[in-house]
Amino acid sequence: MTQKKNKKRRSGLAPALLLGLLLGLAGDAWLQLNTPLAISHPDAVELESGQRLSSLSRQMDERGLFASARQRLYLIAYARLHGEAAQLKAGEYALEPGLTPLGLLTTLTSGKTMLHELRLVEGWRFAQAWKLIQADPNLSHTLESADPAAIMQAIGRPGLNPEGRFFPDTYRFPKRTTDVAFLRNAYTAMDKVLAAEWTGRAPDLSYKSPDQALTMASLVEKETGAPNERPIIAGVFLRRLQLGMRLQTDPAVIYGLGEAYDGNIHTEDLRTDTPYNTYTRDGLPPTPICLPGREAIHAALHPDGGKALYFVAKGDGSHQFSDNLEDHNAAVMKYQINKPHLHP
């Protein structure tokens, strides 16, 4: 009888021990899954397309990002048990101090990847913007040629000159975005801004197309950085065109000189004919000369209604505007020939 009772006692003890073991394991798993990872400062991890959690977690473990080996194993088991291992989304994710394994899993299945920034600056030439894009390590570089025609072909706009076609702004994008996708986004942004400004343009302007307005905006962008002067300069240029006067704007001449420009504009440069020399040719240049910002585009389509036909730089970032040549020559003498000493 005693032996039978002992056998029953032992057979009843085994399930209890197993239950206790499972409860202890579950408790330890819960503790580990809710214990912060070993992240002491903001970091990042990249999950490649098709990569499994076991592979990613191994990479993280090699970087010392798990508080313990058990923490990593529990994470893998939990993800598989709850079907989340198959829901991971590729991309680069931010890791912040205090993040737990469960929080990591939520992050990896959210698709909310890190965004990188790249700024295209108002007044830049396309060549400057392209150089910056090519150098960005977070973009995927797929364009083998830097030829403008090939670039425009790649973004689906064959035959267009890229100058002025990409909106200057700060763009945010996930890692491995292609250079083509980035350029297409910037092109679309400019398209939308130009279309909106063209729709709301002032009446009775002499532009034949939005493209002409974009070219004018690029001249305005290069001539001044003072917001209040942009519509005034646009007004000067439009009045000169209406009167059959040449624009005589130095930034266009400089653009036409290309690499021949040595940092100073000379009398000979003004006489050297290029498609962009507005001293030797009538009308607008054939294309924009830079990436104009929205303010410059708005100014080109909402010009000042004054009478000024001339302007000269005063040396302090602003300009002196004149209605006639006599006053303009006097302003040139004052601000260019006899340059005043400007105090900051």
What is the role of each PLM region?
Residues 1-248, 290-295, 299-307, 315-344:
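Conserved catalytic or metal-liganding residues and their short signature motifs at active sites
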Residues 227-280:
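Small-residue-rich helix-loop
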Residues 280-289:
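Histidine-acidic residue clusters that define the catalytic metal-binding segment
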